[in-house]
UniProtKB/Swiss-Prot annotation:
Keyword GTP-binding: no
Cysteine disulfide partners in this protein: none
Domain notes: The PCI domain is not sufficient to efficiently mediate CSN complex assembly and for biological activity.
One cellular component (GO) term of this entry: cytoplasm
Subunit structure: Component of the CSN complex, probably composed of CSN1, CSN2, CSN3, CSN4, CSN5 (CSN5A or CSN5B), CSN6 (CSN6A or CSN6B), CSN7 and CSN8. In the CSN complex, it probably interacts directly with CSN4. Interacts (via PCI domain) with CSN1 (via PCI domain) and CSN8 (via PCI domain), and (via C-terminal tail) with CSN6A, TSO2 and RNR2A. Cannot interact simultaneously with CSN1 and CSN8 to form ternary complexes. Also exists as a monomeric form. Binds to the translation initiation factors TIF3E1 and TIF3H1.
Gene: CSN7
Cross-referenced SMART domains: PINT
Record protein name field: COP9 signalosome complex subunit 7
Organism, as annotated: Arabidopsis thaliana
InterPro entries linked to this entry: COPS7/eIF3m, PCI_dom
PTM annotation, UniProt: Phosphorylated.
Basic residues bias: start-end ranges: 251-260
Protein family (similarity comment): Belongs to the CSN7/EIF3M family. CSN7 subfamily.
Effect on the protein of changing residue 144 to A: No effect on the interaction with CSN1, but decreased interaction with CSN8
Domain PCI: 1-159
Length: 260
């Protein structure tokens, strides 16, 4: 079972339970959700009306905790630890996993130095063990550890819950991408038309060149015929006259009498 399917089943169960809980029972359920080893999305629980009603009550810290796991990082928790519930080891692990997902949203190459600061890890061995055992084996990221360059290359990372305002930014980005794609398509179509026109012109020029060659061939053929006839006239008829004249002026041989 992949991570998305597993999460869907867990979320469905928790949403059903949370939707019928009273406010005093929501705190333990939120702690359970944020500690679950296979749950990395919390927006559906956060969207429940009775969960939203925790705002302004004595249990509002659990609502803040749920928001932290939906959108925040380990660094955010450290900055607000005094007004949030104390985290269990499972929750700390979960929040650090979510921190890696947040970092991978904007960068596909994560330097070890950045990760060690963001995760409060003191050495490379500990960091690499965490990335392998708690992130890659958990299925939330796919990547490669580059010990020479001291970085974590992340071609895939599971998505987190959308932060407030993030959907609008995504729509704006998609709109810009769509406009760019349309302009690119128009440019490609123009280039295709230009190529077609050039092809037609090339065919036309080639045809004209072939016709020109044929005309030259015909002209040369006609000139050759004329030259041959001229040569026959120059060297054929005068030769006959000369023979005639030679025959006309040739002296006749006298026959001498024979003496006996």
């Amino acid at each position: 079972m992949d991570i998305e399917q597993k999460q869907a089943e867990i979320i469905d169960q928790l949403v059903k339970r949370a939707s019928t809980c009273k406010s005093e029972a929501l705190g333990p359920l939120i702690i359970e959700a944020t500690s679950h080893p296979s749950l990395f999305a919390f927006s559906e629980i956060l969207a429940l009306p009775n969960v939203a009603q925790l705002e302004g009550t004595t249990d509002s810290v659990y609502l803040d905790l749920l928001r932290l796991f939906a959108h925040g990082t380990w660094g955010d928790y450290k900055c607000n630890a005094t007004r949030l519930p104390h985290l269990s080891p499972d929750q700390i692990l979960k929040l650090k996993q979510l921190t890696v997902l947040t970092l991978a949203e904007s960068n596909k190459v994560l330097p070890y130095d950045t990760l060690m600061v963001e995760l409060d890890v003191s050495n490379v061995r500990e960091l690499e063990d965490f990335l392998i055992n708690e992130c890659m084996y958990a299925g939330i990221v796919r990547g490669k550890l580059d010990q020479l360059k001291r970085c974590f290359e992340v071609p895939f990372a599971a998505g987190r819950d959308l932060r407030p305002g993030q959907l609008g930014n995504m729509l704006h980005t998609l709109s810009n991408w769509l406009n760019t794609s349309e302009n690119l398509l128009i440019s490609i179509q123009d280039k295709i038309k230009w190529a077609d026109n050039m092809s037609e012109m090339d065919k036309k020029h080639r045809k004209e060149a072939e016709e020109g060659v044929e005309e030259v061939k015909k002209s040369l053929s006609m000139k050759g015929d004329v030259d041959i006839r001229g040569n026959k006239e120059m060297f054929g008829e005068p030769s006959g006259v000369m023979d005639y004249e030679e025959d006309g002026i040739r002296p006749k041989r006298r026959r001498h009498p024979v003496t006996r």
